[in-house]
Amino acid sequence: MLRSSNDVTQQGSRPKTKLGGSSMGIIRTCRLGPDQVKSMRAALDLFGREFGDVATYSQHQPDSDYLGNLLRSKTFIALAAFDQEAVVGALAAYVLPRFEQPRSEIYIYDLAVSGEHRRQGIATALINLLKHEANALGAYVIYVQADYGDDPAVALYTKLGIREEVMHFDIDPSTAT
């Protein structure tokens, strides 16, 4: 069982939290910066493996300049959990500036933890780190979509937030007339 430790260190201006468990090494979480493209690639590979979609996440990855610029962007957040140097959890989120008021919200786009590291608090630690990032950015809410049938994700998000019933539609831009 992982627990948040009181040992929070700084990596540049990006928070890095260390977590520890009795049967494993230290797990640390941090926001990835533009100098951590290799770790971003590992996060993409993790998403591909855990979502069963290697073709999307691993076979057509952007070049290093693109990923570096994305990690430098003020509207993209990539968080990772490391066991030693291996990425064992990752979260990708977008900062969405609002138009009706000068504030932003954050959308969790992807969140995954490797199979052998699940049920150890890593996803919760990544979301907690995202809360700190959101506070620093002045965001007023973090939201995430969970699919019916993904019971572990629904349970995690129920524990951490308030459920809203919404409808989601994918609109194909190639059908423009």
Swiss-Prot record:
Alphabetical keyword list: Acyltransferase, Antibiotic resistance, Plasmid, Transferase, Transposable element
InterPro entries noted in UniProt: Acyl_CoA_acyltransferase, GNAT_dom
Domain of life: Bacteria
Comp. bias (Polar residues): 1-14
EC number(s) stated in the UniProt entry for this protein: 2.3.1.60
Catalytic activity: gentamicin C + acetyl-CoA = N(3)-acetylgentamycin C + CoA + H(+)
SUPFAM superfamilies for the chain: Acyl-CoA N-acyltransferases (Nat) (SSF55729)
Domain N-acetyltransferase: 25-177
Residue ranges, annotated region (Disordered): 1-22
A molecular function (GO) term: aminoglycoside 3-N-acetyltransferase activity
GO biological process per UniProt: response to antibiotic
Enzyme's top EC category: transferase
Pfam families noted in UniProt: Acetyltransf_1 (PF00583)
Electron transport in keyword set: no
Function: Responsible for gentamicin resistance and has a limited substrate range.
PANTHER family: L-2,4-DIAMINOBUTYRIC ACID ACETYLTRANSFERASE, N-ACETYLTRANSFERASE
Protein name from the UniProt record: Gentamicin 3-N-acetyltransferase
Organism per entry: Pseudomonas aeruginosa
Gene field: aacC1
